[in-house]
Amino acid sequence: MQLPLTPLSFSGTLLLMAMSNFLLWEHVTSSASPRLSTRNLYQRVVELSHCTHDLASKVFTDFNMKFGKSICRQKLMLYTCHTSSIPTPENREQVHQTNSEDLLKVTISVLQAWEEPVKHMVAAVAALPGTSDAMLSRAKELEERVLGLLEGLKIILNRIHPGAVENDYTFWSGWSDLQSSDEATRNIAFYTMGRCLRRDTHKVDNYLKVLKCRDIHNNNC
């Protein structure tokens, strides 16, 4: 028989999740050491990328359940992702036509565009009335994963393409909406952030699988 989670066991579960994430993140960020080969670093980054997208999907589910029902669907059409201005490959053919250096750089650009938003997202979630521990924990963990993934990719870029110049990334201006006293504006901001983060982590995950196949397995995968 499966026992319900008591407050203590629930806290323990969150702690185990946080520790698991910390160890995975540490594997990536400690990779500046020559002891971790580029092959192994790529493997760590791809694993982290998959976990990051999975977590982003869960965070979007949280936001959708909390804010989605009160949102006018017509209004959502007016809100685009702040990363939409970044020119990214949009289908399999375009991905395979993009050389590895450019694909890696655009992947970094997408993640860099989320560097500030995920930090503000955690603060905004923490300030929401009635926020559950689980929802806040997932938001914090997602921030750590995005930042860890970004750091790991920068290391890979410097190793494989030394001297490569990173692309510019898109400025995010959504902080005021997350803090808005207008509930509808705030709800749309949270919903849009969750939807766009899920979309972009999926892109990143797909790009990294292609890059790993090219750079590590010489397309034999």
From Swiss-Prot:
Pfam families reported for this sequence: Hormone_1
The keyword Heme belongs to this UniProt entry's keyword annotation: no
Protein name: Prolactin-3B1
Location of the protein in the cell: Secreted
CDD domains xrefs: prolactin_like (cd10288)
InterPro entries cross-referenced by the UniProt entry: 4_helix_cytokine-like_core (IPR009079), Somatotropin/Prolactin (IPR001400), Somatotropin_CS (IPR018116)
Family: Belongs to the somatotropin/prolactin family.
Listed GO CC annotations: extracellular space
Organism: Mesocricetus auratus (Golden hamster)
GO-annotated biological processes: female pregnancy; mammary gland development; positive regulation of cell population proliferation; positive regulation of lactation; positive regulation of receptor signaling pathway via JAK-STAT; response to nutrient levels
A GO molecular-function descriptor: prolactin receptor binding
Keywords associated with the record: Disulfide bond, Hormone, Secreted, Signal
Signal peptide annotation: 1-30
Disulfide feature: C81-C196, C213-C221
